[in-house]
Amino acid sequence: MKETETKKEYDPLVNYHEILGVTPEMIDWFWDNMEKAYYLWAPDEHVSFVWEIPPNQNGHVGAIHIVREVEPPMPEKTLRMRFESPKACPIPLIYSHAVVIGRLAPDAPAVGGEPISYTMHEYEESPTGTRMRSTYMLEKGWTDGAREALSNHNKRESLGFPRFLPQLYQLYQVIKNPKLNVPCCLKYDSKTLEYNK
């Protein structure tokens, strides 16, 4: 690091969830097939979804999606997010599956642009379904109200998975075309921090 560069400081927000009746494999599948279920995940808060770079084009890492959502009582916002490698994760991962998401500025390059902040959803099988830890590495300056709104939104999303994901995942098992039903495994090697093939 050059003397003129400063290490980015983050302000973490962490939630733990128990997701009943949903397997880690279903959640893996969800991330690369979000266009099928984004609105079901948080029906009153998710407004729009589009892939800028879909995962069926070059794989999971590097795929970019743009969403509009509301985190009440905060106003609607647009987020541009890129799936990152577990190696990019700014915190130690503790569960066996992980999706690492970098939030990009609207004008950041698709490849190589430094994320503004990171979101990590890590999860593993539990006796009742899946246990998950959601960590938001937020840029400094978030108000207490904005942090609480994001935390509550995240909890509602996690509670939403059992409502739709097992049924949707099962329905899509008949579609064998990987362009339409994108296979996704986000289990990673704890030593190399690379996704398993």
Question: What residues fall within each predicted segment?
Answer:
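Amphipathic/hydrophobic helical signal segments and adjacent flexible N-terminal regions
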Residues: 1-5, 185, 197
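Glycine-rich portal/gate segments that line the openings of hydrophobic small-molecule binding cavities
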Residues: 39, 46-110
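A conserved amphipathic terminal alpha-helix motif
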Residues: 136-196
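Hydrophobic/aromatic beta-strand elements that line small-molecule binding cavities or substrate pockets
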Residues: 17, 80-89, 116-125
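Hydrophobic ligand-binding cavity/cleft-lining segments
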Residues: 1-60
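Generic structural hydrophobic/aromatic packing signal, biased to beta-strands
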Residues: 41, 65-67, 123, 132, ...
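Beta-strand/loop substructures that line and gate deep hydrophobic ligand-binding cavities in soluble
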Residues: 97-159
